[in-house]
Amino acid sequence: MHAFAPTGRLASMADDTNYGSLGALAPNWDEGERNIDTDEIYERFFTWVEDVKGVEPWPHQEEAIMDLLAGDHVILNTPTGSGKSLVALGMHFAALCTGRRSYYTAPIKALVSEKFFDLVEVFGRENVGMITGDTHINADAPIICCTAEILANQALRDGRHADVGCVAMDEFHYYGDPERGWAWQVPLLTLPDTQFLLMSATLGNVDAIADKLEDMTDTDVDIIADAPRPVPLTYEYTLDPLEKTVELAFGKGETPIYVVHFSQDAALETANALASTGVSSKEQRAAIAEAIKGTKFTTAFGKILQRLLRTGIGIHHAGMLPRYRRLVEQLAQQGLLPVICGTDTLGVGINVPIHSVVLTALTKFDGTKMRKLRAREFHQIAGRAGRMGFDTEGLVIAEAPEFEIENAKALAKAGNDPKKLKKIKRKKAPEGFVTWNENTFDKLIDAAPETLVPHMKITHSMVLNEVEQGGDARYRIDRLIDDSAQTPEQKERLHARADEIFQTLFDTNVIETEDRDDGGKDYFMTVDMPDDFALDQPLSPFLLAALELLDPESDTYALDVISMVEATLEDPKQVLRAQERQARDEAMIRMKEDGLDYDERMDRLQEITYPKPLEDMLQAAFDEYRHDVPWANDYWLSPKSVVRDMVETASDFTGYIARYNIARSEGTLLRYLSDAYRALARTVPQEKRDEQLDDIISWLRVVVRSIDSSLVDEWEHAGTDTDASEAAANLAAPGAKQAVVEDRRGLTVLVRNAMFRRVQLMDLDKPDELGALDKDWGYGVHEWEDTLDDYYDEHEYVNIDAKARSGELFILDESKENSEHAWKVRQIIDDSDGDHDWAITGTVDLDTTQSSGEVVFFDYSVSN
């Protein structure tokens, strides 16, 4: 494991005079200080709030912290911006002062990470840790930030013996999430000695939750739901086109504006439309240009984003690279972006200050159908409007449907002329369109968030976590079900599911029991549970077993290992859809050329999907594995080829994005490549790797790090309790000479792939694609057309087999590495006659190549 060095934001905290100031007010155990009483905790905390934070607490914040100090649970159902985070700080401080371990949980890793840094800043890095499945930082700290599932699994594994003194559960409305709600309910049922702070702006009626929590813990639950909204909201429904709505809001000074869309494509479409309307002043554009001066926009979407940012418009959605999302958030926090076009991810705790929220629709696609927004979804988004400390009110605008806007435009054009009014043909909603109107908007404004519907499930991993705790696991699982907030019918189904799981575990000899003297049973496991089971890579044990099926002597061994790893990773759906679309387009062209009729083409087209290497072998192996290892039934394999496809086609990140036209989803691709790198580096034993696989792993690391280093750093820096002085000792001394090439093996593969990709395109006779790759170093489309004509005048074809790709035909000269930060490379083309008289030669710019993730040349030529 790597030491967690204080880099970036964490390192800069040491220069902050307030760094760790709240943590310093807690008792110093090393000097023999004792716990302090609640009055002293209250006094120290609120003195710190006023002196260091410089704010005067609101009554509801004081009330909540007093309730927590009294030992009660608190449900904090207060509006966005009402200071829930301050209450959580008070809970963590009280726990630190009384020797209890406290947890902060959130639904997504980005929020957990953000809170981790916030808490480190006020409590000091020695007091705060983070666990997110693939990241463990200072995991023994007294304050832990983690995802909800981490805490739920710990609660099942340790029960009331868990070292969890108190928990702040943020975004608690996820309790009603059909897929993940179980993780918010389980701790409430299994940690009877733990104090809970449940927080959200959109909880609705929580009486049933409060009653259940009080019953399970025999502790009072205080509901605080009457806090006034710090910045009141005003609402408008408009029949103006979106561009005019934004223009009017800009003219009235109602910025910053967040334009909410329910698809990533729609967000970009609006941003492009607004870019020419002048939503920013000359001074704002100059400030933005200065702020982004050092930012490298190296990817296809990055160049689009750069152009939009310079006009004052930001983009924000989950398909972007993390570094681009962070940049937009930082610019917004500095007040530099008048307009941000994004998706409804705005509602999930993203720290972006907004004055006005413009909803482009009051409907969304929920994965199965279009439907109207629910009250909770609406308030989650609308509640982001209004900046505390800046605005006296926030503004929420809803756009009418497009057909209603067109009708209003026609009516306005007709004016009061009866003849013109009579001629107007009112447009209707398209067939099947789920529409809305001003009444829909008014109802959403007035509606309270729906009462949360609880969700529970029983899985093999949940049962095994209970078994690992020891004692009567079956009794505890039955009690978990009986104590849950589910309906009698749901409980009956959960008990039946538990019966199936326990029987399977017995039948496969995974668990056994021993009778106790009191008539009860002790459950225990006969096999070892994988480390971090069900938290990170639950199918890693299967992967290790399946690797035995491969022949290390096979020419495709390294690629087959990659396919096995890819089958255990979460699908990058946008990438796979693009692969399938391209495969079907190519198949359609071939079928038309073969003269197949329309119906037959359509039938065959449905059978074509994205590549799934080793699918039959993997599925057969997995079926057998699930019989022997029944907890694997909680998961499934998903064969696919993304990393393998990139290797086989010698693609770099930028080229792969262009090939499948997925610039808007480059963040999705990068996250997948990062997951693949971590799985390969962590899971595949060294004895199962050959030289080619090691090369590919190194290449993946270079690609991911060069595009967005945070995704590699997040994992590689995970691990540890090194203090600041130890971490600093690991950093290079001032003035120490840094290596020109950080990862020689990975960079070599990147360059070789880039050179051989050009050979592949020569074989396909693709001057357009070659010109797009090489126009910046003097070989555009026309130059490549002439080059290919000359080559094919001399040779019949280009070989692209293993011999053509071998190291014998790739020459690397590193002699100018230190003096000029350059490599001289030569890719000899394996022609049909074996003359080897043609070659692609270039001088690689090492610095730019390593920072951009694609090969950049100082000079370049293709000749014989």
Language-model regions: role of each:
Residues 48-234, 238, 256-281, 316:
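Conserved P-loop/Walker A NTP-binding site and adjacent catalytic elements of P-loop NTPases
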Residues 103-105, 113, 120-129, 264-339, ...:
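Conserved C-terminal RecA-like helicase domain
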Residues 356-359, 363-366, 371-416:
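Conserved segment of the helicase C-terminal RecA-like domain
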Residues 2-7, 12, 314, 333-334, ...:
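Non-catalytic terminal extensions of ATP-dependent helicases
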Residues 164-167, 339-364, 393-399:
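A short beta-strand element within the Helicase C-terminal
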